[in-house]
């Protein structure tokens, strides 16, 4: 499977050292099978006057059963709880790989309203139910990263 990472620089050797804490699926290297999603990730860098660079990887799916994986097929209560734990620094899970929806602008607004206590979980789930997830994959361990092979990059 081909996966993409959007940034301001080429990342030929992904690592976990540069990952940020308290994001959707916790510390890790984030990619997507959706080129358009990676291009959106580049947008914030382009707004700051930097180049947007999409790095491309081949992911060895045949070995995925070697990884402890968590997959979210939709925006759900389970997804929302996981995001809440990761974003608040309370994630203690040991998944190698987490797959699920991106908290894009509309989804992010709903998540923030829930985090701030302005809507309850039921209302948040009702709002998210109709959103089609943009897929992101978080490689959270070196074991998972070993299945990702750099193929090249392009500047937007």
Regions found by a protein language model. Give the residues of each.
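Short aromatic-glycine-(Arg/Gly/Cys) micro-motifs in beta-strand/loop hairpins
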Residues: 1-23
């Amino acid at each position: 499977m081909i996966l993409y990472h959007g940034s301001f620089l080429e990342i030929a050797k992904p690592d976990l050292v540069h990952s940020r804490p308290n994001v959707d699926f916790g510390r890790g290297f984030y990619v997507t099978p959706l080129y358009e999603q990676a291009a959106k990730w580049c947008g914030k860098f382009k707004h700051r006057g930097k180049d947007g660079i999409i790095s491309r990887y081949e992911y060895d799916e045949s070995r995925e059963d070697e990884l402890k994986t968590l997959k979210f097929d939709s925006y759900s209560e389970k997804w929302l709880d996981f995001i809440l734990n990761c974003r608040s620094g309370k994630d203690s899970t040991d998944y190698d790989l987490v797959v699920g929806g991106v908290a894009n602008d509309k989804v992010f607004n709903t998540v923030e309203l829930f985090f701030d206590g302005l809507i309850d979980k039921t209302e948040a789930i009702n709002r998210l139910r109709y959103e089609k997830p943009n897929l992101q994959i978080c490689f959270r361990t070196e074991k998972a990263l070993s299945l990702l092979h750099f193929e090249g990059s392009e500047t937007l």
